[in-house]
Amino acid sequence: MEKITIYQFTDPVCVWCWGNEPVMRAIDYLYGNKVGVEYIMGGLIEEITTLYDLKGSKRQIIERANAIMAEHWLSASERHGMPVNTRHMALFSERYPSSFPQSIAYEAARRIDATAAKRLLRRIREATFVEARRTSQIDVLIELAAEVGINAARFIDEYTTGEAQNDFSQSRTKCRRNGITGFPSYLIKNASTKISLGGYQNISTFHTIIGRLSEGKIKPRRLGPSLANVTDFMRRYQTAYPVEIEVTFGLDRDRTDLMIDELIRGGRLTSEQVGNGRRLAIANAAKAFRATPRTGQNHHEAKQASAKGSATVASHQKVGQ
C-alpha cells in the first residue's frame, strides 16, 4: 500500500504548532506507519527585537516583546486547548534573542536518531509552553535531549560542528521554495500528488485528505472512547493533555473530563496543574530523567555533560548570543 507523508513546516516555539500537537499525535496513534509525519524547521524568530515595532533599550524591548508574546499564547490556548504557562514567561533575553537554537537542536538530534528527534521537538515545545523554560539555552537543550534518550556528548558534537546549522539553513530554503509564509503549514503527499495547507488544522481535514490521496484505502483505526482505549493511549505516550484525548477519540470536552476523572479516581492516571491547564501521566510512570537502554545515561551524567557542553557551544553558537 502506498504511504502518505505529512510535512509540517514549523518552529519549536510556534504556539499554533503547539496547538496542532493533538492532531499530529492523533494521526500517529490512529494511522500508525501508514501515514508518516516529518518536520521542516522554518525559523520563526531570528531576532526578537525586530519582531514588533517597539521603542526603548534592548532590554526594555525584549521584556515588552515577551509580554506581548505571552498574551498571544493565552489567546491561542483558549482557542486550541493546549495549555500554556505565562507566569514569569521570559523566553527571550539579551543573550538569547532567537528561536533558531531550538531548530538547530532538532536538526542535531535528527542526525543522531530521527525518531528521537521528534520526541525532542515535542519536549522542547512542552518545556517552552507549559514549563516556561528558556529553551534556547544550550544547557536546557542538552537536558531535554538526554531525557528523550539522546546521548548528551553526541548531541553537543552534532550541535557544534556546523552541520546541524547547515541542515537548518536547507530546511529554511525548503520553506521558501514551498511558499511558506506562516507556521504551521503542511504539505501532504503520496508518490504522485501533493496538497498544501496553511495554518492550524483540525483532524477532520487530514482524514479527508488522507482518504482522497489513498482513494479510500488508508483509514484510521476505529477506536471507541472506552476507558481501556484511553488507558492504552496514555501508556503509549506516557504523558498527554486532555485535548489530545479529546481529538484522538472524537469526544467533547465534558465527556473527556469525565473519563479522565474516572481514570484518576481508579488510580490509572495522575494529573498536575500546568499553566492554564493540566498535564496527565500514566500512573507510576518512570521519571523523565532516567537511564535509557540506548544511552545508559542518567540525569546526573546528563547534567555533567551539559555543564561541559555549555562552554563548548558558547564558542561555536552563532545564534542566540
Predicted regions and their residues:
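Residue-level recognition of the N-termini of beta-strands and the immediately preceding loop/turn
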Residues: 4, 35-37, 184
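A generic fold-level signal
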Residues: 1, 100, 180-181
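Structural alpha/beta surface segment adjacent to cysteine/selenocysteine redox centers
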Residues: 22-132, 242
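C-terminal cap of thioredoxin/glutaredoxin-like
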Residues: 8, 13, 21-29, 123-321
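Extreme N-terminal starter segment of soluble prokaryotic enzymes
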Residues: 1-7
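Short, cysteine/histidine-rich loop/knuckle motifs that typically chelate Zn2+
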Residues: 16
